[in-house]
Amino acid sequence: MEMEKTMQIIHSPEALHSVCAEWRRQGLKTALVPTMGYYHAGHASLISYARSVADKVIVSLFVNPTQFGPNEDLEAYPRDFEKDSALVRELGGDVLYAPEPENMYAPDHATWVEVPALANTLCGLSRPIHFRGVCTVVLKLFMLAQPSLAVFGEKDWQQLAIIKKMVSDLNVPVEVVGRPIVREADGLAFSSRNVYLTPEERAQAPQIRKSLEMAAGLAAGGERDAARIIEAVRGYLAEHLPTGEEDY
C-alpha cells in the first residue's frame, strides 16, 4: 500500500520540527495524536479520526518518564514498537515520532508546565507529579509539531480538561479535540494497562462502569443528595468489585 511506503519514523525533535514546518508552508492541515504506545482499539479510533480530518497525521509514541512517580510502572509499562508502528502505517499515519527520553529532556531540564487548579484533585491526589509531566511533554510536542489540531481520548477526562485549560491559558494555537471512549464488549474501556489485571480482576472491572451508570440513574430519577449517591455506589462496588480499592 502506498501509505505504508510513505510513513516516516522520526526520532529527533529537529527532524519532526522540520517535516511539520514544511507541511505548514504548503498550507496543509496537520493532526497530532499523542500516545504512549501499546495500541488498542481506542488508539486506533483516534488515529482514524485524525486521518479523516487532516491532510497529514503525526502520531507520537513516547513513554514519558516525567509523568510517572516513584514506585509507578515506568519500567513495566507495556511496549511493542513493531506492532504499534505497523498499526500506524495501516491506519495511514504520515509520521510516527518515537523519541528517546534524552531527545525530549536535557540532563539539566528544569522547566515545568502545571495547571494546579485542575490537577490537584481526583487522579492527581495520589499522583502529585503526573499532570505536571503530562502538560510539559504535551506542550513540547505542540511546539515541535505545531499541529492544526491534537486528538485525545475522553477516557482520561481529567487529562483532557487540563490540556484544554493549558492551551487556553497559554494561547497555544492548537485545537484540542476529545474523542469518545472505546469499550470492549462487556463495557470495560480499552486501556494499555488492562494487561495488568488478573482474570478475576478483569471479570469484575466492568462493574466500575455499571456503578457509574447506577449513579447517573439515581440522579436522573431525582436524587440530589450527593452523599447518598456516593454511598449507593460504594455499596454496589463493595458487593460486585471485592478485588477493587477506592482511589477517589
Show where each model-derived region lies.
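Nucleotidyltransferase catalytic core that binds NTPs
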Residues: 2-248
